[in-house]
Amino acid sequence: MNKFSVKNHKVNRFSTKAQARQSPPAAPRRVLLFNKPFDVLPQFTDESGRTTLQGFIPFKDVYAAGRLDRDSEGLLVLTNDGKLQARLTQPAQKTGKVYFVQVEGVPDNDALTQLKRGVTLKDGLTLPAGAELVAEPEWLWPRHPPIRERKTIPTSWLKITLYEGRNRQVRRMTAHVGFPTLRLIRFSMGNLSLGNLQPGEWKEITDV
């Protein structure tokens, strides 16, 4: 009887430990909105020593929902919520992403129509997009370093809304219609926007 009791006791202790290992406490859900500065990689580590999110974000359990290239600025959504990441980035969701884009030259109606209808890039025809000529945004912050402008060629601003997310898509689209991108700022993804965040600033939100 004693042998059985001891054996049973050991089994119960083992089972409790196994359950504890199999069911770790769930990490708190986090959703951060970050205004990524120019020349910052959208990741926490880099073997080449370039500037990453590590210098700005104190949490390491979040990941970027969609890319924002090193030479682009603006809204980066960081979260550990897989469902939210999918909603913001999966092509089938067609979540609108708004960009303010400074281009070389002044696009005419033909160029804007091409952007709206879709242009054929190396990876295929782009989805219809929003594209309009706008004034320089009032909330615009200075970029460091500033863009390189040619004195003989004017620049202008476009507001472009994409419903897909290909690699460097905005830059390739504007170049395709003859107006290279000089500066690219993502302002919003779905109903999430920069608001009044300045470069390098972030905030945590819960109502999403």
UniProtKB/Swiss-Prot annotation:
Which GO biological-process labels does this protein carry?
A: pseudouridine synthesis; rRNA processing
What is this protein identified as?
A: Ribosomal large subunit pseudouridine synthase E
Give one GO term, molecular function aspect. Answer: 23S rRNA pseudouridine(2457) synthase activity
Q: Which CDD domains match?
A: PseudoU_synth_RluE (cd02566)
- Specify the enzyme's EC class, one word: isomerase
Cite the EC number: 5.4.99.20
Family indicated by similarity: Belongs to the pseudouridine synthase RsuA family.
Chain intervals with Basic residues compositional bias: 1-12
Return the annotated region ranges for Disordered. 1-26
* Keywords, comma-separated and alphabetical: Isomerase, rRNA processing
The record's active-site residues are: 69
